[in-house]
């Protein structure tokens, strides 16, 4: 108790010493500490893993070469592939069938239009689609039509097959309801090619390796109008595609960018002769000129061409009426391939061998079927050039004259000023008896004194009335009609041919035509395009006699109207000689009056029989002959009212081409006519006219007026630059110098940017 005991301090010192030794030992042997475990958000972790795995998979696929070469060029393009029309029957009907190949992705009747997609196809050896969207834009509301549904499907086989609605459903497909906008999106995996996801660009190679997948659109059920008890006649959808095409392996083949596509309504036939199925089209049709021998190697032998054409029966005229066994399924499928039979006479219709698949066409294995009698039907055919035997640059192999112009020359542009139209024109109706087919009475002029209700627009006593708003400015006593594809159009400068044109894109005036049928009047049936008028004698020759004038109008039909036969008063011009003696024969006066046609069994009427009906987009010529006024500058005048005698002096020299047809009562139902028309003057200066023609030639459209008009050429979008390049190249190819072509291209682009603001 007398102080701290020494024996108690010893253990404490020993403890400190032991602690020091332990620290030294720990420094020599470091302790492995347990790492802190990280627990991330599960959602973030899953997303991270998916991206990581996809990235690694893509990396490994590219590393191992499963996706082929790396894309060297890519372009995104929008294109209209056609319109979907009404179904004419209950069964599945093919509306559109088109390859996704970049050279074949063209609008109907686009010809050899050279776009960015075709430009790339002409320069690269491999192609593929990264993505594709197909948009259906309705042209009619859902309440206007009923009875039909449409199905778009992807065909990877490059050949037609037996089509059923259930079979189409077994493909990758989507159904589209009428009247609603719809977009179908396809991804890279749906469109991949056979060569490490790539397709060959050269369509002369095996079809399964080059042409790519097809888009097919079918309709089921007859399309009818909900407003009236009748079939629907208008289009239902416009179909557009937008996709991104990728290219690799540069390999220039210029001809692949110039493959053509043409759509035409014409008479086509199918037959089986000597065991081979043959398709025939008229020699003067646009399709025959399109699928001509200019694409073939020169030969005089009777052989088969090398160019392959895809034929799509969009009008279903052959599909519904032709069934050659055992290949009924091929025609019913709505599309096939053909090659031209060479060495045939130039004065006969053009024949093509039919093939069931692209591979058969490439290997020249035509369809072999039982003998089948030739069947001809009117239908709408779409022809697409699949390949070009010569893929190099085009060279002129034959020319006529010293201008190195290769024939045949395709028509381009619309006529300017006075022009001529030559073609087979058909009488609208014939005169006959009920139940008896009319054969020769071609100029029955329907004359009716009864008029529609006062609430409607006024009409004349004749079958057709030319109107400006609600004012009568002319009448049509007779009518012939023709298809624009069967007409030749040209302009003359004295004795020289100054233009070889087409009626595609020709403008119309504000004058309209009303058509009086049996129990209704079709207002706005057509619009006036051009006209002409000529007198047979003047007041100076016979002041006391009524003036005989012939006036006719070229009109473009707007409405498809199916008339019905009916009995009506019909008159016809009848030329005759007055009573005269032999001594007075040299001074005899010819006269013209209008005589009423009568039935043989009596009565003052005759049946108007309509054997053919013009369609929307066709053209017609209506005329009136007799006493009336007319202004050539405006195309307006007065209708013929007087039916009294007209004196016709001798030695008349006519210049219009219509007198013989207007003065005859008996003749063939159709004949070839050549008519002279006057095109109304457009108040534009020379520069405006040239720019308008360039716009029509290259299918350019003005930009919105609110776009930046002050931007320079360097601010143009790539599409604008390409359009400017198209204009420049076209002007250079026509023989203009660089400075003139470049200046004109810039002027056109500035006008396009101004739009309609002016």
Swiss-Prot record:
The record marks 298-299, 347-348 as: Cleavage. Changing residue 519 to T: In strain: VS34. Residues 21-32 have a biased composition (Basic and acidic residues). Signal peptide: none annotated. Residues 21-43 are annotated as: Disordered. InterPro entries: Astro_capsid_N, Viral_coat. GO terms for biological process: clathrin-dependent endocytosis of virus by host cell. Keywords: Capsid protein, Clathrin-mediated endocytosis of virus by host, T=3 icosahedral capsid protein, Viral penetration into host cytoplasm, Virion, Virus endocytosis by host, Virus entry into host cell. Changing residue 613 to S: In strain: VS34. One of its GO terms (cellular component) is T=3 icosahedral viral capsid. Residues 1-62 are annotated as: Basic. It comes from the Viruses. Residues 63-255 are annotated as: Inner core. Belongs to the astroviridae capsid polyprotein family. The Human astrovirus VA1 is a neurotropic virus. This is Capsid polyprotein VP86. It comes from Human astrovirus VA1.
């Amino acid at each position: 108790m007398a102080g701290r005991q020494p024996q108690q301090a010893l253990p404490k010192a020993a403890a400190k010493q032991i602690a020091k030794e332990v620290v030294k030992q720990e420094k020599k042997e470091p302790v492995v500490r347990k790492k802190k475990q990280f627990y991330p958000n599960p959602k973030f972790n899953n997303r991270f893993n998916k991206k990581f795995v996809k990235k690694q998979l893509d990396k490994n696929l590219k590393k191992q070469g499963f996706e082929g070469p790396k894309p060297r060029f890519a372009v995104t393009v929008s294109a209209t592939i056609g319109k979907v029309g009404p179904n004419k029957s209950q069964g599945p009907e093919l509306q559109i069938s088109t390859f996704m190949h970049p050279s074949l992705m063209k609008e109907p009747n686009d010809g050899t239009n050279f776009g960015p997609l075709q430009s790339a196809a002409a320069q690269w050896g491999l192609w593929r689609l990264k993505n594709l969207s197909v948009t259906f834009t309705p042209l009619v509301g859902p309440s206007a039509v009923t009875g039909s549904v449409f199905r778009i499907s992807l065909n990877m086989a490059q050949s037609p097959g037996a089509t059923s609605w259930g079979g189409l459903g077994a493909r990758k497909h989507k159904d589209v309801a009428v009247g609603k906008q719809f977009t179908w999106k396809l991804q890279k995996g749906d469109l991949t090619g056979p060569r490490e996801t790539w397709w060959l660009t050269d369509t002369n190679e095996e079809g399964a390796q080059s042409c790519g997948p097809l888009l097919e659109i079918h309709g089921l059920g007859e399309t009818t109008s909900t407003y009236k008890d009748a079939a629907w006649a208008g289009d239902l959808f416009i179909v557009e595609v937008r996709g991104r095409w990728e290219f690799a392996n540069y390999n220039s083949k210029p001809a692949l960018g110039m493959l053509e596509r043409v759509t035409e309504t014409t008479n086509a036939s199918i037959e089986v002769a000597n065991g081979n199925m043959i398709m025939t089209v008229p020699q003067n049709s646009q399709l025959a000129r399109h699928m001509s021998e200019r694409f073939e190697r020169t030969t005089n032998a009777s052989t088969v061409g090398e160019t392959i054409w895809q034929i799509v029966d969009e009008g279903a005229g052959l599909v519904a009426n032709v069934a050659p066994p055992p290949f009924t399924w091929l025609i019913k499928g709505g599309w096939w391939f053909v090659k031209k039979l060479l060495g045939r006479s130039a004065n006969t219709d053009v024949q093509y061998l039919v093939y069931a698949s692209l591979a058969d066409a490439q290997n020249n294995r035509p369809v072999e079927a039982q003998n089948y009698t030739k069947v001809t039907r009117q239908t709408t055919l779409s022809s697409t050039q699949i390949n070009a035997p010569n893929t190099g640059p085009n060279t002129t192999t034959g020319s006529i004259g010293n201008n190195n112009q290769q024939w045949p020359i395709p028509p381009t542009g619309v006529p300017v000023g006075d022009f001529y139209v030559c073609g087979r024109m058909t009488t609208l109706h014939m005169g006959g008896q009920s139940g008896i087919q009319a054969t020769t009475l071609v100029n029955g002029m329907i004359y009716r004194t009864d008029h529609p209700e006062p609430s409607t627009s006024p009409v004349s006593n004749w079958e057709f009335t030319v109107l400006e708003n609600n004012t009568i400015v002319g009448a049509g006593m007779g009518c012939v009609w023709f298809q624009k594809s069967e007409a030749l159009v040209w302009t003359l400068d004295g004795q020289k041919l100054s233009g070889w044109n087409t009626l595609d894109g020709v403008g119309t005036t504000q004058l309209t035509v009303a058509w009086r049928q049996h129990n209704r009047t079709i207002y706005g049936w057509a619009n006036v395009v051009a006209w002409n008028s000529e007198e047979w004698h003047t007041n100076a020759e016979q002041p006391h006699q009524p003036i005989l004038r012939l006036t006719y109008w070229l009109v473009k039909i707007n409405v498809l109207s199916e008339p019905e036969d009916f009995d009506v008063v019909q008159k016809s011009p009848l030329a005759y000689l007055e009573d005269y003696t032999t001594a007075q024969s040299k001074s005899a006066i010819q006269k013209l009056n209008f005589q009423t046609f009568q039935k043989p069994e009596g009565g003052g009427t005759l049946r108007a029989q309509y054997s053919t009906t013009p369609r929307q987009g066709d053209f017609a010529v209506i005329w009136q002959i007799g006493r009336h006024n007319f202004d050539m500058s405006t195309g307006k005048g007065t209708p013929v009212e007087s039916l009294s005698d007209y004196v016709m002096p001798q030695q008349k020299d006519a210049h219009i081409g219509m007198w013989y047809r207007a003065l005859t009562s008996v003749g063939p139902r159709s004949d070839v006519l050549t008519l002279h028309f006057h095109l109304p003057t457009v108040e534009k200066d020379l520069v405006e006219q040239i720019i308008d023609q360039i716009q029509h030639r290259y299918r350019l459209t003005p930009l919105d007026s609110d776009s930046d008009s002050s931007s320079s050429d360097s601010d143009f979008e790539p599409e604008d630059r390409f359009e400017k390049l198209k204009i420049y190249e076209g002007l250079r190819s026509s023989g203009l110098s660089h400075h003139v072509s470049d200046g004109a291209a810039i002027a056109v682009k500035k006008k396009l940017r101004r739009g309609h603001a002016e």
